Amino acid sequence: LEDSKSDKNLQKPTHFAVIFDSARKTFRNEIYADYKANRSEPPDDLVPQFEYIRKSVLAFNLPSVDLINYEADDLIATYTEQILAKGAKVTIVSSDKDLMQLYKKDVRLYDPMKNKFITSKDVIDKFGVNPKKIIDVQSLAGDSSDNVPGVPGIGIKIAAELINKYDTLEKLLDKAHEIKQNRRRETIIENK
């Protein structure tokens, strides 16, 4: 995997698109009504900027995509897989930690807030596992920023430790009775 701190490869993309979130409610709210329910409204001075960004994208005739009922993350992940299937490489420009699960060969992540490409070490430092296992870690630990509950008492660090030991969430749940720590074992079994 290419671990570069340079942004030189961002300067000449062959294709690109600006991906927007749709309205606040998405299909995830149909699955889990409290999804992102803890989010406060954006600051008043930020709200008008959303429309300015959309207008700027339109004024510069930049390709953009948004789809009702979907978040930008969903669209980015879908387009990434479609592009990889065609044998092309992908660079995602975003500071969203949830997109780290897309990091792999031929997919680079550039964090504009940190002005650097995300490396495999960055992913492991953040989640304690490789990108393919992030979803298992988040399933166990939950995601407070999205108001998604996990197993009580299991944070990212313990979730990563368990996933690294048992390889997948499914295997962990199948072998939960083998967990040595009584409280942890009981909590995971109770919350299957």
Question: What are these model-predicted stretches?
Answer:
Residues A37-K192:
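Extended two-metal-dependent nuclease catalytic cores across DNA- and RNA-processing enzymes
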Residues R24-R28, D98-Q101:
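Short, active-site-adjacent cap segments at secondary-structure transitions
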Residues L1-D21, F27-E30, D34:
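Non-catalytic, usually N-terminal nucleic-acid engagement modules in DNA/RNA processing proteins
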